[in-house]
From Swiss-Prot:
PANTHER family cross-referenced by the UniProt entry: CYTOCHROME P450
BP-aspect Gene Ontology terms: response to DDT; response to insecticide; vitamin D catabolic process
Gene3D superfamilies reported for this sequence: Cytochrome P450
GO molecular function ontology, one term from the record: iron ion binding
Sequence similarity: Belongs to the cytochrome P450 family.
Example of a GO cellular component annotation carried by this entry: mitochondrion
Keyword Ion transport: no
Protein residues bound to heme: C467
Keywords assigned: Heme, Iron, Membrane, Metal-binding, Mitochondrion, Monooxygenase, Oxidoreductase, Transit peptide
Protein name per its UniProtKB record: Probable cytochrome P450 12d1 distal, mitochondrial
Name of the gene encoding the protein in the UniProt record: Cyp12d1-d
UniProt KW Membrane keyword: yes
Catalytic activity, EC: 1.14.-.-
Lineage top rank: taxon: Eukaryota
Length: 521
């Protein structure tokens, strides 16, 4: 397999670094000046015995099959809102906190190049197994410090500006039209329920949508070319990577000491996805060159073409990271939205009323203008993210010494921030067990929005290192939910008391044979 050569070095745009650096230095000095001998030492933070903790994950142990939310919540009950998860087998200790003041302290002191460790298996693969491809460009998932800052600055304008998404409105609508036809094909003609494995269909839809952005092509996995071998390889590997990461980097694992079967599977998975993505992008590059040689003027509007202009190597890495970070997480979120709406038909009816005003016919086109007028749609998605948090929280590595819950936490410590768990607590969200999209809208009487701590609602992270794909996911989710609810009344007639589990991210714990009834008008 030929590796795409690097035509140019990564463009470096530092932007308003001086003001950010000044703010970072100020925060550091404030944190440093507030540390006194009265604060407890790091060694006094509550924690389990290292060997008992390791034993809990072994066969027959308390956490053998536990999700990250289950075992961190169990430890929270035992040790309180802050505790240490002991490191082992080459992984350092992690401090875990559920205190919003701690979460704010960590973010306020993260500096201009926030550091997020925790995906060591991917970092090792990129640095030591395939340096021929990655070299100095590790991608946003794996890189740190100045290397991360240079890459993020180079690609921020591509992903974070709304104008970069304009060309995707129509093709994303077409992909969703195809998905609607797929639903009609596979649902039972009598019950109108889709098959038990419908989550696979949802994942194919998400993969198709993200693949459009990542590879400038439709893979055909929804209907047209369901057996496309290259696409299926990318589809399966993108789903496997997160599960393997959980086993290697979150749970205790000896892969840093000996080559375990799980790590060998991870290496094969990463290699397979890399080889296919290189092949696809090489085809794109060759096709683009032919068009240039034919005298065609090329307008680089797509995200992929703009990434290729920076560096073909960056295009390979970002295309992989889009799928790796997006397919399972977004597919699970879509399942959760449909479940919430099916279990709350009054909210579904209210959403459909909004959609009918924007989409008078089922095949009405969605565009940048009319999608601005869908506040209830966005509130539904936002409330779903709160009601079914997609993961435990996020991680940061302290850039300097800080005080967390009265304890001195030294520079270089990795902190697991349990912000997502707080979204289901009445302290921060009144009536937390109710699905209330209205909580995100302005009060019709006062015109005011609900006051929410920014450090309890962080589905896409916070600060300079927040998820770069947020706008892409927002567009995909809004398009899909709008299309589905405009075309169907959705029901779920099964038990949904525990529909999801959180391993590394949230994933389905049950099947979702939704009932899709056509809307007449």
């Amino acid at each position: 397999m030929n590796t795409l050569s690097s035509a140019r070095s990564v463009a470096i745009y530092v932007g308003p670094v001086r003001s950010s650096r000044s703010a970072s230095v100020l925060a550091h000095e404030q944190a440093k000046s507030s540390i006194t001998e009265e604060h407890k030492t790091y060694d006094e933070i509550p924690r389990p015995n290292k060997f008992k903790f390791m034993r809990a994950f072994m066969p027959g142990g308390e956490f053998q099959n536990a999700s990250i939310t289950e075992y961190t919540s169990a430890m929270r009950k035992r040790y309180g809102d802050i505790y240490v998860m002991p490191g082992m087998f080459g992984r350092k200790d992690w401090v875990t906190t559920f205190n919003t003041k701690d979460i704010e302290m960590v973010f306020r002191n993260e500096g201009i190049w926030p550091r997020r460790d925790g995906l060591d298996s991917i970092v090792y693969f990129r640095e030591h197994v395939r340096p021929d491809v990655y070299g100095e460009v590790q991608g946003l998932v794996a890189s740190q410090n100045e290397a991360w800052g240079k890459l993020r600055s180079a690609i921020n304008p591509i992903f974070m500006q709304p104008r970069g998404l304009r060309m995707y409105y129509e093709p994303l609508s077409n992909i969703n039209n195809e998905f609607i036809e797929r639903i009609k094909e596979i649902r039972d003609p009598k019950t109108l329920e889709v098959p038990e494995d419908f989550t696979d269909e949802i994942s194919r839809l998400v993969f198709e949508s993200l693949g459009l952005v990542a590879f400038d092509r439709q893979m055909g996995l929804i209907r047209k070319n369901r057996d496309n071998s290259d696409a299926l390889t990318l589809f399966q590997t993108s789903r496997d990577i997160f599960r393997l990461t959980f086993k290697l980097d979150i749970q205790p694992s000896m892969w840093k000491i000996i080559s375990t079967p799980t790590y060998r599977k991870m290496k094969r998975t990463l290699n397979d996805s890399l080889n296919v993505s290189q092949k696809m992008l090489k085809e794109n590059q060759d096709a683009l060159e032919k068009r240039r040689q034919a005298g065609e003027k090329i307008n680089s509007n797509s995200m992929l073409e703009r990434l290729m202009e920076i560096d073909p190597k960056v295009a390979v890495i970002m295309s992989l990271d889009i799928l790796f970070a997006g397919v399972d997480a977004t597919a699970t979120l879509l399942s959760a939205v449909l479940l919430c709406l099916s279990k709350h038909p009054d909210k579904q009816a209210k959403l459909r009323e909004e959609l009918l005003s924007i989409m008078p016919t089922k095949d009405s086109l969605l565009n940048e203008e009319n999608m601005k007028d869908m506040p209830y749609l966005r509130a539904v998605i936002k409330e779903t993210l709160r009601y079914y948090p997609n993961g435990f929280g996020t991680m940061r590595t302290c850039q300097n010494d800080v005080i967390l819950s009265g304890y001195r936490v030294p520079k270089g410590t990795t902190v697991l921030l349990g912000s997502n768990v707080l979204m289901k607590e009445a302290t921060y969200y009144p009536r937390p067990d109710e699905f209330l999209p209205e909580r995100w809208l302005r009060d019709p009487e006062t015109g005011k929005k609900m006051q929410v701590s920014p450090f309890t609602f962080l589905p896409f992270g916070f600060g300079p290192r927040m998820c770069i794909g947020k706008r892409v996911v927002d567009l995909e989710m809004e398009t899909t939910v709008a299309k589905l609810i405009r075309n169907f009344h959705v029901e779920f007639n099964r038990d949904a008391s525990r529909p999801f589990k959180t391993m590394f991210l949230m994933e389905p714990a049950i099947t979702f044979p939704f009932k899709f009834t056509d809307i007449e008008q």
